[in-house]
Amino acid sequence: MARRCEICNKGVVAGVQYSHSHRQSKRTWAPNIKKVKAIVKGTPKTVHVCTRCLRSGKVQRAI
């Protein structure tokens, strides 16, 4: 599955996670990407979309 939203271009972000003793370990934060059938330029197409775009109505789902 793709790790980037095709609508808002949101992708994986890298950073550092701190434990209770303040030791660091590298990790990534991935967006919640869903595979959705949506209307793109008048035709239904399968796209990878983050849930933020789905909830905000930036994507019209094909039913």
UniProtKB/Swiss-Prot annotation:
Entries under Pfam families matching the protein: Ribosomal_L28 (PF00830)
Xref: InterPro entries: Bacterial_rp_bL28, Ribosomal_bL28, Ribosomal_bL28/bL31-like_sf, Ribosomal_bL28_bact-type, Ribosomal_bL28_sf
Recorded superkingdom: Bacteria
Keywords associated with the record: Ribonucleoprotein, Ribosomal protein
Signal peptide residue numbers: none
Keyword Magnesium: no
GO CC annotation: ribonucleoprotein complex; ribosome
Gene Ontology BP annotations: translation
Family annotation (SUPFAM superfamilies): L28p-like
GO terms for MF: structural constituent of ribosome
Keyword set includes Ribonucleoprotein: yes
Family: Belongs to the bacterial ribosomal protein bL28 family.
HAMAP family attached to this UniProt entry: Ribosomal_bL28
Name of the protein described by the UniProt record: Large ribosomal subunit protein bL28
Species of the source: Clostridium perfringens (strain ATCC 13124 / DSM 756 / JCM 1290 / NCIMB 6125 / NCTC 8237 / Type A)
Gene label: rpmB
